[in-house]
Amino acid sequence: MARGQPRRSEEQWTALQNRTECKTKIKLTRCGKITLGILTAVLAAVLIGLIAYFAACGKDSFYYHVSFKVNNIDYDSKFAKPYSQEYMDLNKRIVSLMNETFHESKLRKQYVKAHTVQVSKAKGKVVIHAVLKFKACYRNNVEKYWESVETTLYQKLKGQTGLLIDSSSFKFSDIAMPIAEDLLNTCCGRRTIIHRGHKVAGGQDAEEGEWPWQASLQQNSVHRCGATLISNYWLITAAHCFIRAANPKDWKVSFGFLLSKPQAPRAVKNIIIHENYSYPAHDNDIAVVRLSSPVLYESNIRRACLPEATQKFPPNSDVVVTGWGTLKSDGDSPNILQKGKVKIIDNKTCNSGKAYGGMITPGMMCAGFLKGRVDACQGDSGGPLVSEDSKGIWFLAGIVSWGDECALPNKPGVYTRVTYYRDWITSKTGL
């Protein structure tokens, strides 16, 4: 029994220990509840703050239009061309000024971007027209936000900026989102998607927004030809697309990279075919199409730049042809827009006996490979052949016209040379 006494003592200790642990657990549980309550309150506050922030600074944006005269910059006619070096240099200067203005202000977290949308003339000096984009905050006090942006910009322009701003010419107003986005995307030859490679016959799928000037000409809801957007009203395409049907009522236009999901569909108001085009000859294979209503520019719908009549696209330079044409002669048409990188071939080579034997005239140009591989094909007709300059701007060099089948050796694609018809385009469209 003597060995039983420690056991009773052990039992007493165990019971005491259990009671002590129980009390400790109760205390920890109470502390845990307090801690949990504090954490819950903090998380709730953070969540409410985030909700409040996104309610005040959501996906919507504020847009403003500003214009002002600059007294120390003489107007140059080249400012009328958004792709000219003079225009781009001036735009860069204005955008830098806007960035500096708002990045150094209390609006720096809301400021998104600025862009010069037009340069006009007043008494021999330039007038800047720009659009500003801000995150939409202070929704309950739009006027206060408007005044804050205006005051910040006006005070900056009055100071030492390197530009002599005529303060009396300063104008500031808000602008609706669709119009603002149209203006922000109005520059020709620009795109938001960077190409990853090119393969049309022997081609490769394009990405959404990669070739935003590409349009589909549809007769009775069926894709017949490609076309290129050159303004918010005008498209340019091949005359031979209309040899069987030239009534505008029979045609529709859509954009986007999927034929199955057309974007911005438009009716056709007018079709103007070159007066000297005569099928089956290939000369003067050019036409312009006027839309019934203008398209609004956005990231996926933009215009290509029209080259000047004197602009050169040298032999062996890279160009890209796009379209929904068949992937091989007499093949099926794809749903996804196709792209193909080819090279310009000089007319002398293209007119050789092995190639087209003298059929290439000055109003035509060849592009592709003498070995074949990549080429435009049926259904690509009227679509763009575009060239990228050193500044990353895309110009319309050619219009898909004709060829001997698709991607055959010594039979590259033949295109209408846009520079040759530049004056004709201006006479019909004013562009």
Curated annotation (Swiss-Prot):
Ranges in the topological domain labelled Extracellular: 55-431
Tissues in which the UniProt entry reports expression: Expressed specifically in Purkinje neurons of the cerebellum (at protein level). Also detected in spinal cord.
Gene Ontology cellular-component terms listed: dendrite; extracellular region; perikaryon; plasma membrane
Protein encoded by which gene: Tmprss11c
Cytoplasmic side: 1-33
Record-annotated active site: 240, 285, 381
Keywords: Autocatalytic cleavage, Cell membrane, Cell projection, Disulfide bond, Glycoprotein, Hydrolase, Membrane, Protease, Serine protease, Signal-anchor, Transmembrane, Transmembrane helix, Zymogen
Chain ranges of the Peptidase S1 domain: 200-430
pH dependence: Optimum pH is 8.
Protein known as: Transmembrane protease serine 11C
InterPro entries named among the record's database cross-references: Pept_S1A_HAT/DESC1, Peptidase_S1_PA, Peptidase_S1_PA_chymotrypsin, Peptidase_S1A, SEA_dom, SEA_dom_sf, Trypsin_dom, TRYPSIN_HIS
